[in-house]
Amino acid sequence: MIPMIVLATTNQNKVKEFQEILKDFAIEIRSLAEFGPIPEAIEDGKDFDENAYKKAIHTAKILGIPAIADDSGLEVHALNGAPGVYSARYSGEGATDASNCDKLLEELAGKEDRSANFTCVISIATPGGPALTYEGRCDGKILTEKRGKSGFGYDPLFYFAEYDKTFAELSMEEKNRVSHRGKALAEIKAEAPQIIKWLEQRLSEEKPAKPDHSEFEGNDWSK
């Protein structure tokens, strides 16, 4: 049995979402904060997939245990997919949730198409390099003003029609059921036995080779 897996993030909001959704997962999920500070991964990937893998493998190699990481963001159609991988730092150096939301509203001023989607890619990596990848997406639109007090990031602006609420107006249970991250984590829960078996096999190898990341797309358990 795999004793633990570390969640490669210092974002406590993400930690809460992961731990809540995966509370019945058969592996102990530990927060990165429990291991003390480590060098930050360089998130210079061209998409969410690359950045999630970079964070997961970076953490797994440093700590010597499996790591799970996500990269997620908002893609606004009228802005050609922006802010995308730059969602957390959209308003520049020292960006905050508030400044990012303000920047988004400025960029969308006068635009009729306010459709958008949240995307989340989760990578589970072993210290030797292999990784499994999961993805979730949620479609909505950007409002002209903030609504709600819960959540984080762009949640106060992201309107989800099915509930007639923004993500910041949803309870944690509601958000976890429909959000991009919730959908990706639901896939992980559904494949928990296979994931545990895969991790055990990889960790039992003395010198696991570091394959190309694309080799593991589609989660082929035979590799």
From Swiss-Prot:
| One Pfam family linked to the record | Ham1p_like
Residues the record lists as binding substrate? T9, T10, N11, Q12, N13, K14, S72, F152, G153, Y154, D155, K175, H180, R181
Cofactor(s) named in the record: Mg(2+)
Q: Which GO terms describe its molecular function?
A: dITP diphosphatase activity; ITP diphosphatase activity; metal ion binding; nucleotide binding; ribonucleoside triphosphate phosphatase activity; XTP diphosphatase activity
Query: Its Enzyme Commission number?
Result: 3.6.1.66
Q: Which reaction does it catalyse?
A: XTP + H2O = XMP + diphosphate + H(+); dITP + H2O = dIMP + diphosphate + H(+); ITP + H2O = IMP + diphosphate + H(+)
Sequence positions that bind Mg(2+): D71
The UniProt entry, under Gene3D superfamilies, shows: 3.90.950.10
Q: Which domain of life is it from?
A: Bacteria
- Taken from the UniProt record, the cysteine pairs bridged by disulfide bonds within this chain are none
- HAMAP family linked to this entry: Non_canon_purine_NTPase
Q: Which family does it belong to?
A: Belongs to the HAM1 NTPase family.
Return the protein name: dITP/XTP pyrophosphatase
